[in-house]
Amino acid sequence: MLARQTIEAKQRTPTGAAWGQERRLEFIEFRLLWDGKINRGELVDFFGISIQQASLDLARYIELAPGNLDYDRSSKVYRASPSIRVVFTQPDAQTFLNQLSSPAVGPSALSFIGWRPPFDIVRYPTRSIRPDTLMQVIWAIRDRQDVEVSYQSMRRPDMTRRWISPHAIAFDGVRWHTRAWCHENQYFKDFVLARIQEIHRVRPSRIDATQDARWHSFVTIVLRANRALTRGQRIAVETEFGMSEGELRVRIRESLVHYFIRQLSLDRDTVPSNKIELLEWVNQSELQPIIAEATSR
């Protein structure tokens, strides 16, 4: 059983040697927890330090976490002891899995993982966003500007040209969009960034983004295990989603509620009657007006 030990932190600067060593001590503990062993060469290879510095780091770790590792002379590695206590990093499954998948989705240099089990991830089609489009939208948000865009809506057969006043961007789990005031429709709505075909002009904006009530307001979505599941299945779902007293409460912006519900197939009105989902949306009737408004725009 891992026991949490707190170490009094000293004031450090990001570029100072103390900060650098603390990062290396975290690395040592991470490798001990997940690989079960570590040697000086791993520190040298990962951080580009000398053998002497690696020895000092291991000695420092042993000083701060006595009993966490034992030296295996035959293999010339330090092995994690069965009674290892957490000092620098709390083991977290999601952190490990995020790092495991990092070579598939980004640079692996930030990952502390040593040995990697065989794995793969499902790669969904990505929405292609033009870099210049994203840059100009971000600049418009920063500088409080309106932008005139050519936009292809899925509600209209042809591309239209309109002014929008972006004030935020958001990711719904599948695609990125900008939250903006639409000067044509005269309300705040979402514009999929990949569907902005061109940005023509910019101008100073007079739109007050604080008036976007749906963006600035939050609601709590209450979920529970589907009552159609067996008792054993419900317990498994409650454990899987980390529910407390049989419920999972998710705080979310009103403007993102309908995306959340859609991704988890929680709307009873759209889920096939013969399909049993893992989760039920407890307070659907309370939040249904938000869904209705969002999907009508």
Could you say what each language-model-derived stretch is?
Residues 61-64, 199, 263-267:
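Conserved short hydrophobic interaction patches
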Residues 75-77, 146, 175, 247:
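A generic structural signal for beta-strand entry/edge sites
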